[in-house]
């Protein structure tokens, strides 16, 4: 097995790379010697990150929308031409329009499906021919605890993350014996702008679970490239809870009011600490 601390000569593509988990993942792979292809819509933020990483010609900045299949095709071709290989794909880009299923606009529903589900499926499909030529191939999907247990107020988002996990688990079986690692990490709340900047609209249930940092999720992503884990919830205790809720849905529903009260207290505390409450 390859040294999990050494990614010299390994090319890693990261979507949603400009901030949060994506930026932390870029730093984690970069400090281990990887060559990076940073993908996001905002060119300025990508260039700021590239300068901060200070990896010289080991970084390729690629501003694009992950839902653009032609652009995905082109970036894979350019990556191989520049770095000689495509080794690891991290499907991290995400979009979340919060609210009841009835209140979320049709446009936002479509955007969640396109960004959270269709884009990583297409990126993975397009990357597979390149990954088959790699000595250390892997696809790591960033899912969510909302893809392990349904979250009211995030119905479409939950559906996309359930779908992404299912795709990864099924694809891992399809590719059994080919040596391509397919895995998903399913974090709960993460201390990033993705939820913290709009804390009032985030469900109380979400904040019932321990909050991870972007760096913790990034380290989990790096570890998934080489270990035997296919489906990693974060933190593990939350994974146990979501499994219990899945196996015993009546029990899960009975626990929900208690968890929502706990989450409400956490939200109130966070708002006070950030001067928003």
Regions found by a protein language model. Name each.
Residues 100-101, 105-113:
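Substrate-binding pocket helix/loop in short-chain dehydrogenase/reductase
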Residues 44, 63-74, 106:
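The beta1-alpha1 cofactor-binding region of Rossmann-like NAD(H)/NADP(H)-dependent oxidoreductases
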Residues 124, 160:
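Active-site helix of classical SDR
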Residues 32-49:
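Conserved glycine-rich Rossmann-like NAD(P)H-binding loop of the short-chain dehydrogenase/reductase
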Residues 144:
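Residue(s) in the substrate-gating loop at a strand-loop-helix junction
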Residues 174-238:
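SDR active-site lid
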Residues 18-20:
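Conserved glycine-rich cofactor-binding loop
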């Amino acid at each position: 097995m390859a040294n999990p601390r050494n990614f010299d000569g390994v090319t890693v593509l990261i979507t949603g790379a400009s901030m949060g988990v994506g930026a932390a993942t870029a730093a984690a792979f970069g400090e281990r010697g990887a060559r990076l292809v940073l993908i996001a819509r905002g060119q300025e933020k990508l260039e700021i990150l590239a300068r901060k990483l200070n990896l010289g010609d080991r970084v390729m900045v690629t501003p694009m929308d992950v839902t653009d299949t032609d652009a995905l095709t082109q970036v894979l071709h350019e990556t191989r031409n520049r770095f000689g290989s495509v080794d690891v794909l991290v499907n991290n880009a995400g979009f979340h329009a919060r609210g009841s299923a009835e209140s979320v606009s049709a446009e936002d529903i479509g955007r969640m499906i396109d960004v959270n589900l269709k884009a990583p499926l297409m990126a993975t499909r397009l990357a597979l021919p390149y990954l088959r030529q790699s000595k250390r191939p892997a696809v790591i999907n960033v899912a969510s605890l909302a893809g392990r247990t349904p979250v009211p107020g995030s119905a479409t988002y939950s559906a996309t993350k359930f779908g992404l996990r299912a795709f990864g688990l099924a694809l891992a079986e399809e590719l059994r014996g080919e040596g391509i690692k397919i895995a998903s990490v399913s974090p709960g709340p993460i201390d990033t702008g993705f939820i913290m900047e709009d804390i009032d609209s985030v469900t109380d249930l979400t904040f019932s679970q321990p909050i991870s940092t972007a760096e913790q999720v990034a380290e989990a992503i790096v570890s998934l490239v080489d270990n035997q884990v296919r489906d990693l919830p974060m933190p593990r205790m939350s994974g146990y809870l979501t499994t219990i809720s899945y196996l015993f849905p009546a029990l899960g529903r009975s626990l929900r009011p208690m968890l929502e009260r706990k989450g409400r207290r956490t939200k109130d505390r966070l708002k006070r600490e950030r001067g928003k409450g």
